[in-house]
Amino acid sequence: MFKRKSTAELAAQMAKLNGNKGFSSEDKGEWKLKLDNAGNGQAVIRFLPSKNDEQAPFAILVNHGFKKNGKWYIETCSSTHGDYDSCPVCQYISKNDLYNTDNKEYSLVKRKTSYWANILVVKDPAAPENEGKVFKYRFGKKIWDKINAMIAVDVEMGETPVDVTCPWEGANFVLKVKQVSGFSNYDESKFLNQSAIPNIDDESFQKELFEQMVDLSEMTSKDKFKSFEELNTKFGQVMGTAVMGGAAATAAKKADKVADDLDAFNVDDFNTKTEDDFMSSSSGSSSSADDTDLDDLLNDL
């Protein structure tokens, strides 16, 4: 059941999450704000505490999601756990120093962070059937910063930290989305004054909410992440020979050249040659050397 927690404890958990710095597939248990035709929408939600007292009430997932060469790469990133070596995309970014050398490529493949929480939907004008129910909610850095701003305050200046997830002393969150220059803008979203969730002292009501919640720590469990080998294979399929190194890249380029030469072969010219002409030209050392080089490169892979 729910327990009162100190804001200092939550602040420590939030700091740990911020140090870990996603993408998740469509989830039926996920709540999404419905927007009107103009791209605007609003609702009132309440962030809930963790289902596990030892865990933070939020989860952070890092992912790479992009399309290249007509193929998609959408995978969670091991940097979710602070491990940058087990992600082929992170290695590609680092090896090629994309941040400094290729801003366009970097923007395409860079890490993307998503934040998750259990929420109680207080008011949802566009979908009133959701009101009073608990969902998982995915949100971005703008809202994450607003949550942190309620916790990481300047106590010396008389500010009081608020654990917005506390069922008794937390605060409802007014989620407002407006379209600005073609993008969803969350600037007008804000926390209201501290208040208890209505009827929260009723243990049966607490149990009802608690049973609808999910253990967010399962989302970031390491056994949910694919191996480097599996990710590297997928990354290579999407990126093509651009990410291949050494003999593999050379062999791929050689194979591409052979294919181009075959495509450019003049069939009409071939039909005009005699058998002697053809046999003579095909016995040349250059072609034979190219074939041998290609075979050697492929055998070395």
Swiss-Prot record:
Family assignment from sequence similarity:
Belongs to the Tequatrovirus single-stranded DNA-binding protein family.
List this protein's GO terms for biological process: bidirectional double-stranded viral DNA replication; DNA recombination; DNA repair; DNA replication
Q: Which GO terms describe its molecular function?
A: metal ion binding; single-stranded DNA binding
**Listed InterPro entries:** NA-bd_OB-fold, Phage_T4_Gp32_ssDNA-bd, Phage_T4_Gp32_ssDNA-bd_sf, SSB_T4
This chain belongs to which protein, by name?
Answer: Single-stranded DNA-binding protein
Gene name, per UniProt, is 32
Q: Which Pfam families does UniProt cross-reference here?
A: gp32
Q: Which Gene3D superfamilies match?
A: Replication Fork Single-Stranded Dna Binding Protein
What is the protein's known function?
A: Single-stranded DNA-binding protein that participates in viral DNA replication, recombination, and repair. Coats the lagging-strand ssDNA as the replication fork advances. Stimulates the activities of viral DNA polymerase and DnaB-like SF4 replicative helicase, probably via its interaction with the helicase assembly factor. Stimulates the unwinding activity of UvsW helicase, inhibits it DNA winding activity.
**Notes concerning its domains:** The acidic C-terminus is involved in modulating the ssDNA binding properties. The N-terminus LAST motif is involved in the cooperative binding of the protein to ssDNA.
Please list the residue ranges that the record marks as compositionally biased, kind Acidic residues: 290-301
Q: Where is this region: Disordered?
A: 272-301
Q: Which residues bind Zn(2+)?
A: H64, C77, C87, C90
Annotated region (LAST), positions in chain = 3-7
Stretches of Low complexity bias are at 279-289
Per the UniProt entry, the signal peptide is none
Key words, A-Z = DNA damage, DNA repair, DNA replication, DNA-binding, Metal-binding, Repressor, Viral DNA replication, Zinc
Share what the entry says about its subunit structure, partners included: Homodimer in the absence of DNA, monomer when binding DNA. Interacts with the DNA helicase assembly protein; a ternary complex between the helicase assembly protein, the single-stranded DNA-binding protein and ssDNA is an obligatory intermediate in the helicase loading mechanism. Part of the replicase complex that includes the DNA polymerase, the polymerase clamp, the clamp loader complex, the single-stranded DNA binding protein, the primase, the DnaB-like SF4 replicative helicase and the helicase assembly factor. Interacts (via C-terminus) with the viral SF1 dDA helicase.
Taxonomic classification = Viruses, Duplodnaviria, Heunggongvirae, Uroviricota, Caudoviricetes
